[in-house]
Regions:
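Compact, glycine-rich, soluble single-domain proteins
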Residues: 1-69
Length: 69
């Protein structure tokens, strides 16, 4: 399921990162790689703040939809 469907506080493992090559590379540089653990901190209007690799990252709804957990 896409990251946008995850509720706040849930911990999930990333199964796949989709999108164009440029988008995938951008997300990988932020730490969104297959097998990484991601926790949703908060979600407002589809935009999310997530915890990944001991960092908090804000991503928009379009980016979050490309991350499959």
């Amino acid at each position: 399921m896409p990251l946008t469907m995850v509720k706040s506080g849930e911990i999930n493992e990333i199964k796949k990162v989709g999108g164009k090559e440029e988008t995938r590379r951008f997300l990988e540089n932020l730490g969104f790689v297959k097998g990484s653990i991601v926790t949703v901190i908060s979600e407002i209007g589809g935009n999310m703040i997530v915890s990944i690799k001991e960092s908090r990252v804000a991503i928009n709804k379009d980016m979050a939809n490309k991350i499959i957990v």
